[in-house]
Amino acid sequence: MRAFRRAAVLAASLSLAFAVPAIAQEFPLTSGEYVEVTSVTVDDGHNMDYATFLAGRWREQRDFMKAQGWITGYEVLANINKRPGEPDLYLIQRSKSLPDGAESERRDQIMRDKVKMTSAQLEAASGDRAKFRHVIGSSLLQVLNFR
């Protein structure tokens, strides 16, 4: 009986010894929300023009997207200590997941209906802003949360 007890204690100890490394090997980060970052420069003398667009139509569209549950938040960040070649602004948009192609098209149609503009009109408006606003890059990032 005593030998059996020792064997049981030894078996339990060994199983714990092997279980601890398995727990320790679990990746310490989990996938979080997606963050879309658009890098923008604005020509001198047009900061008010672009700020007015951002505070108006851009913000209205983001508020609608948030109300629909498509995004979780958005913000505009200014590059305070800008170096040559860097953007003036970063437009940030956060979402829990990314839509597939069909869902993306569905959302685009809902947005066009909301703003009462065709794709051609939206492109023309973007072209008008491109006279003083320049998108110099974009990134899609994913937040990594600690366990």
Regions found by a protein language model. Name each.
Residues D43-Y90:
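N-terminal, post-signal-peptide region of Sec/Tat-exported proteins
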Residues T30-G45, L89, A102:
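Acidic/histidine-rich, surface-exposed loop or edge segments in extracytoplasmic proteins
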Residues A24-P28, L77-I80:
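Short beta-strand/turn micro-motifs at beta-sheet edges
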Residues M1-L14:
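Bacterial N-terminal signal peptides that target proteins for export
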Residues E26-L29, E60, F64-T72, I92-Q142:
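An amphipathic, aromatic/His-enriched active-site/gating alpha helix that lines ligand/cofactor pockets
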Residues F18-A24:
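Sec/Tat signal peptide C-region and signal peptidase I cleavage site
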